[in-house]
Regions:
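Well-ordered alpha/beta subsegment
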Residues: 128-190
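Short, cysteine/histidine-rich loop/knuckle motifs that typically chelate Zn2+
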Residues: 55-58, 72-75
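Short functional micro-motifs and their immediate structural scaffolds
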Residues: 64, 78-79
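Short metal-coordination and nucleic-acid-contact micro-motifs, chiefly zinc-binding Cys/His arrays
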Residues: 49-52, 66, 83-85, 150
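Residue-level marker of beta-strand positions
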Residues: 86-88, 156
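A broadly conserved sequence feature marking short terminus-proximal activation segments
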Residues: 6-54, 151-152, 160, 165
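Glycine-rich active-site loops that engage anionic ligands at enzyme catalytic sites
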Residues: 90-148
Length: 191
């Protein structure tokens, strides 16, 4: 799990006291419990602007979000591996009524399910390496209404990170300006 020198090998840094990680996102407190080593490690890597996935040492399949055992073979043996952070919108939810007050000024906003280019259709045609995250602008702010209207299933995106504190960051998705985009990405008929 990581390398001893990066301070992330056990999810909390070798030789350090186990402590909850705290941050802030859109003015809301973020807490990653000290018992959640997998997510602590994931968000710490994000804090270093690195997107990493767990790779099973037995079946060699990557997985996101982090889990304590491989969903494909049930092995607990894994290592954190970097992934490129580019992919395609597999599905999305367009939110028009914010439950959290901090999101109200950003309506409508998108919650994307992105299928990463690594491990597409593996181990079967209906599976892949997927990660959720908000659609954002390149500066890490939530996407504008205009950007939301341009994104649908098939849009090419890449990861960016919004710092939430000294050690952790939130992975977000921005339109990949370097990638070929669909002329008209498929969108749910809501307007």
């Amino acid at each position: 799990m990581g390398h001893p020198r990066d301070g992330l090998s056990d999810g909390n840094g070798e030789g350090h006291l186990v402590m909850s990680l705290r941050g802030e996102y859109l003015g809301m407190p973020v807490l990653i419990d000290d018992l959640d080593k997998d997510n602590q490690t994931f968000y710490r890597y994000c804090g270093q602007n690195e997107l990493r996935a767990q790779e099973c040492l037995d079946c060699r399949l990557k997985r996101l979000p982090p889990t304590s055992a491989c969903p494909f073979c049930a092995s607990e043996r894994m290592e954190w591996r970097p992934v490129e952070g580019r992919g395609t919108v597999y599905s999305y939810g367009e939110v028009h009524h914010a439950i959290q007050g901090a999101f109200r000024s950003h309506l409508p906003y998108h919650l994307l399910l992105v299928e990463l280019d690594e491990q597409k259709d593996i181990p079967n045609p209906y599976d892949g390496l997927r990660l959720q995250g908000n659609l954002a602008e390149i500066d890490g702010s939530l996407a504008t209404k205009e950007t939301v209207k341009r994104v649908g299933i098939g849009t090419r995106v890449k990861v960016t990170f919004k710092q939430m504190g000294d050690e952790i960051a939130m992975p977000l998705w921005v339109i990949d300006q370097e990638a070929e985009q669909p002329t008209t990405p498929w969108r749910y008929p809501i307007e």
